[in-house]
Amino acid sequence: MLFSRPPIRSPWISAFRSASQLPLSRPRFFSISLSRYSVDMETVNTSERLSRLRELMQEHKVDVYIVPSEDSHQSEYIAPCDGRREFISGFSGSAGTAIVSLSKAALSTDGRYFNQASKQLDNNWQLLKRGVEGFPTWQEWTTEQAEGGKVVGVDPALITASGARSLSETLKKNGSTLVGVQQNLVDLVWGKDRPAPPREKVRVHPEKYAGKSFQEKISELRKELESRKSAGFIVSMLDEIAWLFNLRGSDIPYNPVFFSFATITPTTTELYVDADKLTPEVTAHLGQDVVIKPYDAIYADAKALSETRKQEAGETASKFLLSNKASWALSLSLGGEGQVEEVRSPIGDAKAVKNDVELAGMRACHIRDGAALTEYFAWLENELVNKKSTLDEVDAADKLEQIRSKHDLFVGLSFDTISSTGPNGAVIHYKPEKGSCSIIDPNAIYLCDSGAQYLDGTTDVTRTFHFGQPTELEKKAFTLVLKGVIGLDTAVFPKGTSGFALDVLARQYLWKEGLDYLHGTGHGIGSYLNVHEGPIGVGTRVQYTEVPIAPGNVISDEPGFYEDGKFGIRIENVIMAREVQTTHKFGDKPWLGFEHVTMAPIGRNLIEPSLLSDAELKWVNDYHREIWEKTHHFFENDEYTRSWLQRETQPISK
């Protein structure tokens, strides 16, 4: 599963020609026909909702109101009760910001969702295409609407402190003001129809999978706080809290997290979570080491912490650490900039470096997951080619989930399965829906991006197959993508190298043909946690320059190519950074490389061997031999799947 990349502003480059001289253009996203794009594209009439919101804005003396996508924890994925931007605008994509003035409304989103937004927004809304020349950013549009000393409002829990500070400084230049509106105005419009917050039980994540007790993790965090001379750390990111306390939840679909905050000081540990969500096992697990407090008490307690600290130490009081992703509301509760030091979270940094137990779990769960994928693709080919069955994309995705669920330690999926046939594969974040999705065409490319949550790890894998006869064009595109996968997988680099620097290794073969893909190459992956995990990754995001790749990092390796209206190709493996031995050690520093753990065959009939170097050909054959050795025993009583796996892992040659 992938992150987006900012749209490229330069003109599209004409593409290579295959042996058959058919043109392969650079991807033009989202011009796919509505009948093939499965998201419900029905326009929502927002007139009544906007009218009510504007009444509330006037009551609160606000001229412009901002509605972000995020929740109070700045989560990438949110619970239904936090879908405020979708409710007010009708746009259901995962990324975007809505801005409403007393007379206008605008929705800003990125290139993944331009088509979807244009279909879902009614005529009350203006679409701001992020990164496209001629369209203002949402901040610029907001500033323009606020000219003349107007007041801009936002729920301070839904915007980062740095984001609020930046916007406030911009608004001040034209005499306008940013204010925090404590009561969320969209919630008031939503009223009783707003989904209730989830009340799922929290569960213990055993140390045999976590690899370290939560007491050890907190002790290490306190050492970090001491080295920074900090008064404490207020934790707001849900995956960081789950990891720190060795707990998991089910409050957000596909993400095993639970709504909570935490405060860690040199002498106290407090977890803010609704007590009725804690089982006796969780209570016993936390014991006397952790004080449980009501979820909603965090803001008042943060304020009290800050006041107490100032009274005890006066002007020399040390500051509280706060993640640079934490909300403006939390920062204000702690006394604002003067009392807070915004940092990249030390918990996030520690979580990204998996311990030996977590790494072993990732290896093990990917073997089981690979066996599930092998069974699935063998089944799918048999249904489509031999039985001539009619299957739609959802039927196939459901079958994959059913197969995965048979394996040990399976908990659920790690994201919505992207099961896409033909041109649907060119839609980056395609999500098939029953009743509107496509029938799988055995004579077209099939792209499947899927993943699962297991107690011992999280998986994320993309495979692209063709169950008929691929064209020379498709084979060339697929092989260029495969060369990129191998390029990153086999990289050797000095300690201190960033994912930003490594990105070119996966793109180089497409670049040589004047081609590219408009998403990141790789993202961090949690250990039975979020499938997207920072701060590390491989791509062109500025944040990927900040933290170098380190041993124990687990990331995806997923270059792709997308021919709009025809097909999409992506190959994704999970790789783990480790120290490697080199002939020399320039600079007397460690050198790093990667270990791949994904164990699913790569579509053999899509590979054009003549485009591979001898080393790349050896990599493919070695990889397929490894898959056979590690997974064939799963099929001792399934001769068809075993034969399919044997065929798909046979050596290839030029």
Swiss-Prot record:
Keywords, comma-separated and alphabetical: Aminopeptidase, Hydrolase, Manganese, Metal-binding, Metalloprotease, Protease
Residue positions binding Mn(2+) 1: D460, E558, E572
Protein EC: 3.4.11.9
UniProt cross-references to SUPFAM superfamilies, sorted A to Z: Creatinase/aminopeptidase, Creatinase/prolidase N-terminal domain
Residues binding Mn(2+) 2, per UniProt: D449, D460, E572
GO biological process, one term: proteolysis
Molecular function as annotated in GO: metal ion binding; metalloaminopeptidase activity
Cross-referenced InterPro entries: Creatin/AminoP/Spt16_N (IPR029149), Creatinase/aminopeptidase-like (IPR036005), Creatinase_N (IPR000587), Pept_M24 (IPR000994), Pept_M24B (IPR033740), Peptidase_M24_C (IPR032416), Peptidase_M24B_aminopep-P_CS (IPR001131), X-Pro_aminopeptidase_P (IPR050422)
Taxonomic superkingdom: Eukaryota
Free-text comment on the cofactor: Binds 2 manganese ions per subunit.
Family, as annotated: Belongs to the peptidase M24B family.
Biological role stated in the UniProt entry: Catalyzes the removal of a penultimate prolyl residue from the N-termini of peptides.
Protein name (Swiss-Prot/TrEMBL): Probable Xaa-Pro aminopeptidase P
Gene field: ampp
